[in-house]
Amino acid sequence: MLSCQIQGNGQESIALCCDFLAQRLSICMDIKMRNTFEERRKELLQGHNTTWVNIFDSTCAYYYAVTGQTERIPTLFGAHMLSTVNFLAPGRPMMEMIENQVYLAQGEYSKVIGRSESILAMCQALHYDLVALHVQIQLLAANWKLGKTEQALELLRRSLSQAFPDGILMPFVE
């Protein structure tokens, strides 16, 4: 696995990206994880780098939200304390998208609708089309759950037309 080759090379940020990908793929594929979430978090804590721990917590929050394990979502996201953490501006849209996923998993559909416009604006400013696609899908799910089927179907059409030319399917699977 790529993350095993990166481990120990001082490329922890890339290893965290690999962890996130492996977590996401494990939802729909039989993928053996290198460590449990608890073991990986313990490794990161030994490095005394809160940025890495917060990034890992964000990936766990996303995984647990998507899989419906809301009781396991790390406190930073589960209690919606994201605003207490400083992230570099380029990372903010992704973190907000993950928090949106947590709100969705917690049944806070109106909150997802209310937050999505500002997240989409951040995505547009930074040209983060993939994060924007995730947010649009969250928005359509929230609208659907609230019985706003016309808005949800329009968002689905828009999202599909945006994703299919590039063969982007993972956000729809999740």
Where are these regions (language model features)?
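Alpha-helical repeat scaffolds
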Residues: 1-3, 31-44, 69-83, 110-120, ...
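Alpha-solenoid helical repeat architecture
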Residues: 5-21, 31-32, 44-60, 83-98, ...
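Residue at a conserved register position within TPR or TPR-like alpha-solenoid repeats
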Residues: 25-26, 64, 103, 136, ...
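Basic/polar, acidic-poor N-terminal "presequence/leader" segments
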Residues: 59-68
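Residue-level detection of beta-strand scaffold positions
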Residues: 73, 93, 100-104, 118, ...
